[in-house]
């Protein structure tokens, strides 16, 4: 057995000791380090953090949402996944149709004002339920624009039509595995202004050698405490799914980050996490009867032997 999260723990420690203080668009402030890389050997296990509980069900449903080409949070809510709620909710409360309580700067205010947080949580609950119950409302306010699902599966071409980058890269892996063009990108400068959140994981590239497939992700911005553990598990899962469809063994997940940062209101949580001793990493189970990415459902993907420490809560910077 192996402790696969060690590169993540090492990077957290590096940012804590060597990071630079920076302001950011959320107004929270960060401790930031530019140009970091972590490597995870997926043949040794699955790099789901053990130093805190990471809800794997959310990672599964989010990745399947991306792979469906979906950009509406309704699918996520149907699977009790609230990762993207705040960005859709922001579009709703900033619209002319919203007539509820003032939600200006709801992210920061909900952290500092307990009374406002109660109002915010009630409004968010009503919003989520309306997305589930009202199809027209969901189409208008549940859609996040040109986020990952759109860019991966429906990249719009200038001359009309679209490119399915996932299908194309799988075809390349099968037919020309030595290619240096096996890339999927989510960064389209034209779409950045219309996205709820411009892509943080900008592009990823596959590499095949000796019957093994690896992937390298370039992430422009990484919330090290909340977001990056999800990204590590999500791209490791994606690589396993691609390996299954292409008949290859899994190699490495290489995670390259631009601005790797710890929010100032996460510093205590990071200290607590770093004080914990990691357990052996779990193993990933994929339904052996499924071969194609499109056929996988939630029940076909599991982690086994997942021993972990308790949850550490931290606020999301929106």
Curated annotation (Swiss-Prot):
The lineage of its organism: Bacteria, Bacillati, Bacillota, Bacilli, Lactobacillales. Belongs to the thymidylate synthase family. Bacterial-type ThyA subfamily. It is found in: Cytoplasm. PROSITE patterns: THYMIDYLATE_SYNTHASE (PS00091). Catalyzes the reductive methylation of 2'-deoxyuridine-5'-monophosphate (dUMP) to 2'-deoxythymidine-5'-monophosphate (dTMP) while utilizing 5,10-methylenetetrahydrofolate (mTHF) as the methyl donor and reductant in the reaction, yielding dihydrofolate (DHF) as a by-product. This enzymatic reaction provides an intracellular de novo source of dTMP, an essential precursor for DNA biosynthesis. Homodimer. Pathway: Pyrimidine metabolism; dTTP biosynthesis. GO terms for molecular function: thymidylate synthase activity. It comes from the Bacteria. This is Thymidylate synthase. Keywords: Cytoplasm, Methyltransferase, Nucleotide biosynthesis, Transferase. It is an enzyme of class 2 (transferase). The active site is at 200 (nucleophile). DUMP binds at residues 25, 180-181, 220-223, 231, 261-263. (6R)-5,10-methylene-5,6,7,8-tetrahydrofolate binds at residues 223, 317. GO terms for cellular component: cytosol. It catalyses: dUMP + (6R)-5,10-methylene-5,6,7,8-tetrahydrofolate = 7,8-dihydrofolate + dTMP. InterPro entries: Thymidate_synth/dCMP_Mease, Thymidate_synth/dCMP_Mease_dom, Thymidate_synth/dCMP_Mease_sf, Thymidylate_synthase, Thymidylate_synthase_AS. It comes from Lactobacillus helveticus (strain DPC 4571). One of its GO terms (biological process) is methylation.
